[in-house]
A protein has these predicted regions:
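Conserved class I S-adenosyl-L-methionine
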Residues: 53-62
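Glycine-rich SAM-binding Motif I of class I
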Residues: 64-68
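Conserved SAM-binding loop
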Residues: 93-94
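Conserved beta-strand signature within the Rossmann-like core of class I S-adenosyl-L-methionine
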Residues: 148-156
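Conserved SAM-binding strand-loop segment of SAM-dependent methyltransferases
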Residues: 99-110
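Class I SAM-dependent methyltransferase Rossmann-like catalytic core
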Residues: 12-48
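Conserved SAM/SAH-binding beta-strand->alpha-helix loop
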Residues: 86-88
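A short glycine-rich, Lys/Arg-flanked "PGG" loop and its adjoining helix->strand segment in the class I
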Residues: 135-147
């Protein structure tokens, strides 16, 4: 195998190894052993009109695979916040930030969001999170969107659709080229996010 080919393959292998090691340390924060596929990232990124996006957030930014897709579409004067708490993956995102000043890495829990965004992309494994935390994150996301803003969330099952409906109107699509296949939800807020769900989830208000 040529050195040129190895130089292309080894970084990809290292990314996968880093992701799996982070999964082993904190599986509840990831939801799956495998990072998102390029097709899933593309489907999520194509869910918004990028000409209208001045400030976006990515929750659960992982190893940066979706982050790169979003940056490739982001306007030159726009901002993308990447939220992540695992130290090793935060360091990887900071390296990406050093190459692209439009990226701002936020080393905080997603439920601490206080900004306003035109789009929020979420890779958080909502079903794996405690019910109260899940409710706080969805409420924060709902309230953090500007008028006309969109919340894009992918999940591996449809179990939480009733919970999503407490905050958002949504449509969904299915991406089979991913391990495992995933549902992508494109969500717009109800007029009032401060409601209490009638599902089994307790929604904080």
């Amino acid at each position: 195998m040529s050195n040129k080919l190895l130089s292309k393959i080894l970084p990809c292998v290292q990314c996968r190894v880093d992701y799996m090691m982070s999964f082993a340390v904190s599986p509840r924060s990831f939801g799956t052993l495998f990072p998102s596929s390029g097709q899933l990232c593309k489907r999520m990124a194509e869910s918004v009109d990028w000409l209208q996006i001045n400030c976006a957030a990515e929750l659960g930014a992982g190893d940066g695979v979706l982050t790169r897709h979003l940056l490739s579409r982001l306007k030159t004067d726009a901002v993308l916040e990447a939220w992540k708490i695992q130290p090793k993956l935060v360091r990887k995102l900071i390296k990406l930030q050093e190459m692209d000043p439009r990226l701002q890495v936020v080393n905080k829990f997603a439920e601490k969001m206080t900004g306003k965004y035109d789009a929020i992309f979420s890779c958080l494994p909502l079903l794996s999170l405690p019910v109260m935390v899940r409710g706080r994150i969805l409420k924060r996301a709902c309230n953090a969107l500007n008028d006309g803003g969109v919340f894009i969330q992918f999940q591996y099952s449809t179990v939480l659709e009733k919970t999503l409906s407490c905050f958002f109107e949504w449509t969904r699509s299915y991406e089979v080229v991913n391990v495992p296949p995933a549902w992508v939800y494109i969500c717009t807020p109800h007029q009032k996010c401060n409601i209490r769900g009638n599902t089994g989830d307790v929604i904080l208000i």
